[in-house]
A protein has these predicted regions:
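Acidic donor-binding loop at a coil-to-helix junction in glycosyltransferase catalytic cores
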Residues: 94-100
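Catalytic core of nucleotide-sugar-dependent glycosyltransferases
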Residues: 52-57, 132-152, 216-220, 251-255
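Catalytic donor-sugar/metal-binding loop of nucleotide-sugar-dependent glycosyltransferases
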Residues: 101-119
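Long helical/loop segments within the catalytic core of UDP-sugar-dependent glycosyltransferases
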Residues: 18-92, 135, 142-146
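Acidic donor-binding/catalytic loop of UDP-sugar-dependent glycosyltransferases
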Residues: 5-22
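Active-site donor/metal-binding and catalytic loop motifs
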Residues: 115-129
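Membrane-embedded multi-pass helical conduit in multi-pass membrane proteins
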Residues: 170-255
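Short aromatic/hydrophobic "clamp" motif used to bind/position activated sugar donors
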Residues: 2
């Protein structure tokens, strides 16, 4: 099998041993646990750390335990040789890891998850570099939507499996939520313009939207850090700024 890493990664001493266990269990494509080398450098690296810790537990582990498919996540993963041999690594979007995962899901092939195969990835310190990186990811995700919505829809109709449906939800799920948010904000504005709402009412409605937007990500992050035994005290500044990190991603999606 091949194991894929970024050049700046630090690989846990037991990574290959734990991946080999998965290989011996019949898994052919397995994502390892993506941890962070520099989570406490500043609020940006802390944001990345919390994001990946959340993905590890709430996306990859949760889906794997439910019999669904995790996703390849850029680095720290294994692909068995006979998966690559027939046609090589054939992708055409900027998020080739997600694309490769979706192609496997369309074929009904479940990806594996190895929580004890750990790789430590370094994150950018500057906001400008982070903005460029996440813009690239967003463009790649949009490319995947254009390229794989139809094949996934066909797979859902033909195979009628929850794994195919989950893959379709992954690439399309954020769109309805985004549209719903815009609709709700628009309704509030129209009611205000039509004098059906006072300025105080408008302010209170905005607060109702914004407070959960700030509190829930922090609360969720703290719960995940507690479950994964991550040190919370050195991450307090990053936790406080985490909603801003996620909010900047929303601006990137608008771009």
């Amino acid at each position: 099998a091949f194991c894929i890493f970024d050049a700046d990664n630090i690989v846990d001493v037991n990574f290959l041993k734990n991946m080999n266990k998965k290989l011996c269990q019949g898994e052919d494509v397995v994502q390892g646990y993506r941890d962070i080398k520099n989570p406490t450098d500043n609020w940006i690296t802390a944001g990345y750390a919390i994001f990946y810790w959340t993905m590890n537990r709430m996306y990859h582990l949760a889906r794997y335990n439910l019999g669904l498919s995790p996703l390849i996540n850029g680095t720290g993963f294994m692909v068995r040789f006979d998966v690559i041999k027939p046609e090589g690594w054939v992708t055409k979007t900027l998020t080739e890891d997600i694309e490769f995962s979706l192609k496997r899901i369309i074929k009904g092939k479940r990806l594996g998850w190895a929580v004890d195969a750990i790789v430590y990835d370094e994150q950018p310190l500057g906001f400008k570099q982070s903005w460029k990186q996440r813009t690239r990811w967003t463009v790649g995700h949009i490319q995947c939507i254009k390229e794989y919505t139809k094949p996934l829809t066909v797979a859902v109709k033909e195979n009628k499996t929850l794994m195919n449906f989950d893959g379709l939800l992954y690439i399309l799920g954020s769109i309805p939520m985004f549209i719903l948010t815009l609709v709700l904000l628009g309704i509030n504005f129209l009611i205000y313009v039509g004098n059906g709402m006072t300025e105080l009412d408008l302010l209170m409605n905005c607060v109702r939207y914004l407070v959960p937007t700030f509190i829930l990500p922090i609360a969720t992050a703290m719960l995940i850090m507690w479950l994964d035994k991550k040190p919370i005290k050195p991450m307090l500044k990053g936790l406080a700024c985490y909603p801003l990190f996620l909010g900047s991603w929303l601006l990137i999606n608008f771009k």
